[in-house]
């Protein structure tokens, strides 16, 4: 006679939650972003390039009222609201997150978004209108900070994961429709 289920699922039967990994990646990106911005503001002369590798890679301190890589300048309050929505959405999604790769990608986006939000809320000219500190210049690319490539890299990772069939709420690749019917 088979045993009746007790109604509780053993911890090893449940897929692992990845919120801790997501938050660790986000905290690392956020800390790097804040520390590098504080150092840039303290040590770099505004608008004057400091060569690192010739004229190709320089430290160049600028204040950016736009989005990543100086896009959407002049829409600071809209960008602040969008970034706040992204942060809230990632926290909401994080409760159901199972995939470690999605945790890394979302953590990169969360850390970068929060890094730039810190500037938007606490830097001049004022809350919701603060300008983001950018200081890395590579070739012809717009000046950026640690948060910008983190957000872009995290987004690229999520697109690649989606293309190859990895969902945020499963451990591996999703099964094809014909395999799941067997």
UniProtKB/Swiss-Prot annotation:
InterPro entries the record matches: Peptidase_A8
Pathway(s): Protein modification; lipoprotein biosynthesis (signal peptide cleavage)
First-tier enzyme category under EC: hydrolase
Residues annotated as the enzyme's active site: 134, 148
Cysteine pairs bridged by disulfides in the record: none
Residues spanning the membrane: 21-41, 74-94, 98-118, 146-166
PROSITE patterns: SPASE_II
Main location: membrane
Pfam families, A to Z: Peptidase_A8 (PF01252)
Places the protein is found: Cell membrane
EC code(s) of this entry: 3.4.23.36
Reactions catalysed according to its record: Release of signal peptides from bacterial membrane prolipoproteins. Hydrolyzes -Xaa-Yaa-Zaa-|-(S,diacylglyceryl)Cys-, in which Xaa is hydrophobic (preferably Leu), and Yaa (Ala or Ser) and Zaa (Gly or Ala) have small, neutral side chains
Keywords, alphabetical: Aspartyl protease, Cell membrane, Hydrolase, Membrane, Protease, Transmembrane, Transmembrane helix
Role of this protein: This protein specifically catalyzes the removal of signal peptides from prolipoproteins.
Name of protein: Lipoprotein signal peptidase
Species for this entry: Mycobacterium avium (strain 104)
Classification lineage: Bacteria, Bacillati, Actinomycetota, Actinomycetes, Mycobacteriales
